[in-house]
């Protein structure tokens, strides 16, 4: 089956993951007000539109060099750009203050001339992207089509009606990139845990935490899924934050993660979480299965 791959890219908190979730009518991708919650390029289910099988790739948002995951995110963006056919740039209408930074990022995209380009302005709380800034983006990005839509009041039919007006071309230079599958069970488990780390710990902890599934087993008689997880952080002080006083924080994280996963798995779930310090660099997620 030939698939057209659409990479969704843009500044942090522009609405990239929100858009893809709405297109799929689900919440497979994490949405948060925290910057750079998407650290890896994630592939979603096939959607049949415009007589094509379309897959949307959630790409990490542009980030500055001072960010702790700058190298990882930059690598993921480059990987995604080499493995897509269409580049969908999402910018929130109130992100006028990010225009200079965005301009430098768009200039680096000029080498990917073979990609079809679409520009989506997320009309946010009745605030407008200035005409000057819009012109800068149009000049630097040179999209085939511009879509202006409010993701808080998303009109899927309107989106597709405009999207279909674009001449969607396959990228003959596209590489066969093995993106993470949003429907992979291990991904759902790891992403579910990281979402709760973000909610409870905030600040820098979610960006430096690395998560691993150590063991996973299913008891058919009890209809019970047992999951043993490890959270690794570089410093003892960070470990103490995640565990919390009298282990209250890690208990809350575990309970919330289990509750989240019960929506994805048709069985009871037992979760055991161990927190350790690990100074060497680890992958964001370590899977049992690919």
UniProtKB/Swiss-Prot annotation:
GTP binds at residues 10-17, 58-62, 122-125. CDD domains: Era_like (cd00880), KH-II_Era (cd22534). Disulfide bonds: none annotated. Residues 10-17 are annotated as: G1. It is found in: Cytoplasm; Cell membrane. Residues 97-100 are annotated as: G4. Residues 2-144 form the Era-type G domain. Residues 201-279 form the KH type-2 domain. GO terms for biological process: ribosomal small subunit assembly. Residues 121-123 are annotated as: G5. GO terms for cellular component: cytosol; plasma membrane. Residues 36-40 are annotated as: G2. Belongs to the TRAFAC class TrmE-Era-EngA-EngB-Septin-like GTPase superfamily. Era GTPase family. An essential GTPase that binds both GDP and GTP, with rapid nucleotide exchange. Plays a role in 16S rRNA processing and 30S ribosomal subunit biogenesis and possibly also in cell cycle regulation and energy metabolism. This is GTPase Era.
């Amino acid at each position: 089956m030939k698939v057209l791959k659409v990479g969704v890219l843009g500044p942090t908190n522009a609405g990239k993951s929100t858009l893809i979730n709405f297109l799929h009518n689900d919440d497979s991708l994490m949405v948060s007000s925290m910057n750079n919650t998407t650290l890896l390029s994630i592939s979603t289910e096939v959607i049949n539109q415009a007589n094509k099988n379309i897959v949307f790739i959630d790409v990490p948002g542009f980030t500055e060099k001072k960010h702790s995951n700058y190298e990882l995110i930059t690598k993921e963006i480059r990987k995604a750009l080499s493995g897509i056919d269409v580049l969908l740039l999402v910018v929130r209408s109130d992100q006028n203050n990010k225009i200079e930074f965005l301009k430098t990022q768009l200039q680096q995209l000029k080498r990917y001339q073979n990609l079809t380009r679409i520009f989506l302005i997320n009309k946010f709380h009745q605030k407008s992207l200035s005409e000057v800034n819009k012109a800068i983006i149009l000049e630097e990005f040179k999209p085939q089509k511009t879509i202006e839509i409010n993701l808080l009041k998303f009109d899927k039919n309107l989106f597709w009606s405009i999207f279909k007006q674009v001449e969607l071309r396959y990228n003959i230079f596209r590489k066969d990139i093995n993106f993470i599958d949003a429907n992979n069970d291990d991904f759902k488990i790891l992403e579910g845990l990281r979402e709760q780390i973000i909610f409870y710990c905030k600040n820098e902890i979610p960006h430096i935490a690395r998560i691993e599934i150590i063991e996973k087993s299913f008891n058919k008689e009890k209809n019970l899924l047992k999951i043993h997880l490890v959270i690794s952080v570089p410093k003892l002080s960070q470990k103490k934050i995640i565990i919390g006083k009298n282990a209250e924080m890690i208990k809350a994280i575990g309970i919330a993660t289990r509750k989240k996963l019960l929506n994805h798995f048709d069985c009871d779930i037992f979760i055991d979480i161990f927190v350790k310090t690990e100074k060497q660099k680890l992958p964001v997620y370590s899977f049992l299965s690919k």
